[in-house]
A protein has these predicted regions:
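Short catalytic/metal-binding and nucleic-acid-binding patches
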Residues: 1-132
Length: 132
């Protein structure tokens, strides 16, 4: 999360979230790592009663478009996702090779239907527009 910015949490708010792998290294380059992340994403969705409107997992970063959890904050949900995945991936493939994630993440409140459409389009186009 960006330092110094005030966060506004509202139960009806949609959030566009981006977080990156440590040093922007392409750590999602193998199917087992990708599949493990999808399992953790589903765990987060259930635990926090989130609606995931869209997501994309790129080789070195992730974008999510989600609602504000009814009984927690987006920060709580992202923390849970990143921590639970990091613990599981360490035991699966990393074998103590250090951090998986950058420490912070980007969270933008989606203010209206037009911005929602733009952000969802960005999520859908990200794999196509990147050099992958």
């Amino acid at each position: 999360m960006t330092r110094g910015l005030r966060r506004f949490h509202h139960s009806a708010q949609t959030h566009f979230i981006t977080f990156s792998c440590y040093r922007r290294e392409p750590r999602f380059s193998s199917p087992p790592v990708y599949d493990l992340f999808l399992g953790c994403l589903e765990d987060m969705r259930r635990r926090f009663s989130l609606c995931i409107y869209g997501y994309v997992v790129m080789p070195e970063h992730v974008h999510l478009l989600v609602n504000e959890p009814p009984c927690a904050t987006v920060a709580d949900a992202v923390h849970y996702l990143k921590l639970s995945f990091a613990k599981r991936v360490q035991s699966l493939v990393m074998a103590g090779s250090g951090s998986f994630w950058q420490k912070r993440y980007y969270d933008r409140n989606v203010r209206d239907a037009e911005e929602f459409k733009v952000k969802l389009g960005y999520v859908h186009r990200n794999p196509v527009s990147g050099d992958w």
